[in-house]
């Protein structure tokens, strides 16, 4: 469950390390985001000479949550961290590599992220 002020790891090579959720997109008073939801983030930590700078406001898709994902068969997939992948305005990933596992729930809307990820659960 991701809400405003949640700090997330960045799971791509865009250059950002940590981002903070500043808005959950997809509704006027939407409070929480889950895996596959798009959020507005502010870059809090970035490596030098990278594609994104500290303080930049961007869109991101949530790829891992500590709360986990409940599947239709009743299984639950949980992760150790909350992570997101940065997106441009066309909802395409900025980075060219995805680090760590991602879930199959991203398949409908973010096939590019699934193809870049090394491990899909």
UniProtKB/Swiss-Prot annotation:
Q: Which Gene Ontology molecular-function terms are recorded?
A: large ribosomal subunit rRNA binding; structural constituent of ribosome
Q: Which Pfam families does the annotation name?
A: Ribosomal_L14
InterPro entries according to UniProt:
Ribosomal_uL14, Ribosomal_uL14_bac-type, Ribosomal_uL14_CS, Ribosomal_uL14_sf
GO terms, biological process = translation
Q: Which PROSITE patterns does the record associate with it?
A: RIBOSOMAL_L14
Q: Matching CDD domains, A to Z?
A: Ribosomal_uL14
Keyword Ribonucleoprotein listed? yes
Annotated Gene Ontology cellular components are: cytosolic large ribosomal subunit
Domain of life according to the entry: Bacteria
Database matches in SMART domains: Ribosomal_L14
Under the subunit heading, UniProt states: Part of the 50S ribosomal subunit. Forms a cluster with proteins L3 and L19. In the 70S ribosome, L14 and L19 interact and together make contacts with the 16S rRNA in bridges B5 and B8.
Indicate the family of this protein: Belongs to the universal ribosomal protein uL14 family.
This chain belongs to which protein, by name? Large ribosomal subunit protein uL14
């Amino acid at each position: 469950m991701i809400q405003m002020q949640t700090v997330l790891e960045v799971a791509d090579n865009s250059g950002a390390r940590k981002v903070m959720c500043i808005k959950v997109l997809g509704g006027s008073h939407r409070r929480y985001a889950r895996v596959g939801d798009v959020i507005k983030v502010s870059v809090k930590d970035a490596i030098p000479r990278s594609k994104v700078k500290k303080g930049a406001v961007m869109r991101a898709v949530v790829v891992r949550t500590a709360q986990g994902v409940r599947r239709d068969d009743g299984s639950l997939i949980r992760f150790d961290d909350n992570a997101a992948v940065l997106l441009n305005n066309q909802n395409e990933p900025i980075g060219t590599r995805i680090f760590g596992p991602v879930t199959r729930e991203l398949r409908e809307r973010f096939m590019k992220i699934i193809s870049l990820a090394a491990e899909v659960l």
